[in-house]
């Protein structure tokens, strides 16, 4: 979970803190700042700097921080919950690109979404759940049929 009342830098480095702590557990501020700056540039954040509080960012930039803090780690799986909710079309496309790039790197992604078009466009498999139960799993290879998916959802 992203911390809204703290800086971009702290949000970026918190999930990776054990990766940058020295042998005695001390943190190297210079290394933390460098890591945050690299992430700021890599994720094209529009901000005054990594010392800016996250709550002062636009919705799209908040989402970039939230996604970027995890993609900066060496992950095997990423779970995202409505990653494009409330962002403009440009940021939405950028987030999709980030998720596709993660897939190319071998990071398995579970995307929770309530947008059917998003699920069809991004997924290799769609799992339709209703009332906490899996109703159907549909693979891209068998073809995503929007009407069929809606029928299972209703």
Cite the ranges covered by each PLM segment.
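Glycine-rich phosphate-binding loops of nucleotide-dependent enzymes
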Residues: 1-154
């Amino acid at each position: 979970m992203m911390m809204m009342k703290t800086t971009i830098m702290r949000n970026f480095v918190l999930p990776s803190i054990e990766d940058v702590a020295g042998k005695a557990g001390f943190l190297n501020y210079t290394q933390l700042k460098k890591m945050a700056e690299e992430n700021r540039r890599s994720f094209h954040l529009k901000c005054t700097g990594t010392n800016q509080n996250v709550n002062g960012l636009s919705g799209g930039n908040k989402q970039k921080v939230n996604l970027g803090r995890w993609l900066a780690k060496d992950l095997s799986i990423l779970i995202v919950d409505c990653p494009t909710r409330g962002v403009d079309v440009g940021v939405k496309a950028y987030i999709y690109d980030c998720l596709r790039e993660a897939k190319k790197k071998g990071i398995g992604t579970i995307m929770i979404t309530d947008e059917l078009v998003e699920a069809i466009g991004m997924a290799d498999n769609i799992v339709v759940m209703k009332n906490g139960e899996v109703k159907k799993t549909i693979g891209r290879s068998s073809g995503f049929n929007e009407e069929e998916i809606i029928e299972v959802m209703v």
